[in-house]
Amino acid sequence: MKRILALLTSFIISSSILHAQEVNTTESWSGAITIGTNKLNIGFNLLSLSDGKQACTMDVPEQGANNIPTEIIKNDADSLSISITALRATYKGRKNSAESIVGQFSQNGMSFPLSLTPGKVELTRPQTPKQPYPYATEEVVFKNEAEGAVLSGTLTYPITYGFQVKETIPVVLLVTGSGGQNRDEEIFNHKPFLVIADYLAKHGIASLRYDDRGVAQSTGPTQGTTTENNLSDAEAGISYLRNLNKFGQIGVLGHSEGGTIAFMMGANKSVDFLISLAGGAADGLKILVGQNKASMQLQGIPAIVIEQYATALNILYKDRIGGKQIADHKQYVEDLCQANKLTLPENLKANLAKCITFGGEWITWFLAYDPSEAIRKIACPTMALNGTLDMQVLSKDNLPVIKENLPANDKHLIKEYDSLNHLFQHCAPATALSYGAIEETISKEVLEDIANWINSLK
């Protein structure tokens, strides 16, 4: 139960099952279970429906899961009993008073004390800026005419805007990581891009962040899109900023896939400077196999099993890059293991079978892409950052590629931060992937380094 519930990420379910009934009242209770040295917040929402019946949903905000359907087994003056079928879990509690329920949360044969008090789970995010902001923001729209995309975003002006010559004010386009994300790159109630935009504005730097296609108010085709399409949207954002004629140097800051896109934009000579936050520099195959190995090591899986799984995954992904047609996924995995003398447990074989098609065209393109060629073409000042505890884009696999291929420039800054994860949060090895459980959104040192480096380019 290193992750409550490892199954949980598969059940980020909306409350649509309740839409047929109007909710008259909601009574929320919350508490936390302790797993080793980690705390995980859990909330239950008891709903009174218009037909007189009761319903209940469960929230685990650190894992981005809200409104998970549950079944109320018993709810009377003395006790509360809930079944969470999707997670094979239960909660049984005794009501001590109107302010306290003491009970046990059980899943897969393990049980954890869980005391509840009235109120919803509230995650603490101390770095998220609160309005009113001491700087101006503007809601904007720009178009990628070539691909029929319309992107909505926020242009944030620095505090000093209007008091400086505009040619001295740099502006940065913020590009999110993989998957559809909003302009704040929001994850587990963290809003990294909002925090970055706020910090930059307070240090004389403008920024534009935008919702990805199909997210919030942004529109455009999403079926079958790859990193190249996301690059095209980012290039449209840069063109928009240039046409505004409001700023001086125009750069890009990308995180994860966005960091790789930043390298591509540098190769295209479309930006004056670039910042890659945990951007992939190694080829996609190496990145994905590496992150799988790192995740398995965190889970305490034996080294021999990890190496066998990595061998199988490497072969499978190479077949996928080559366009091999696989009709029977289960049989393909069995044949692969037999041919390579791999003795993997059934659950890992099932994972391999899913990897044959998982992620669609985006993953297939990503696996085959090697950013090093783009990096060799970069002429503009480049900042590339990674954390030693990044389990998604491993610094040991990526920073050396950047150092080896990036043409010399005394304005470059390549830096590795000790004990920072993929989101640049401080963490321990065991909590490197526990993004939601960490209150810090992004290291202050990273924010300072970004702002200082951009301002040094003026």
Question: For the regions a protein language model found, what residue spans apply to each?
Answer:
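Central antiparallel beta-sheet cores of small beta-barrel/beta-sandwich binding domains
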Residues: E22-K95, S100-N108, Q127, Q164, ...
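N-terminal cap/lid segment of alpha/beta-hydrolase-fold proteins
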Residues: V121-E167
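Short substrate-entry loop that stabilizes the transition state in hydrolases
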Residues: F163-K166, S178-A201, L208, G284, ...
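Alpha/beta-hydrolase active-site loop
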Residues: G224-L244
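Primarily recognizes the serine-hydrolase "nucleophile elbow" in alpha/beta-hydrolase
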Residues: G237-I301
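Accessory cap/linker subdomain of secreted extracellular hydrolases
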Residues: L277-K377
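Short beta-strand/loop motif that positions the catalytic acidic residue
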Residues: I378, A384-N386
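Short alpha-helix in the alpha/beta-hydrolase fold that links the catalytic acid
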Residues: C380, M391-N405
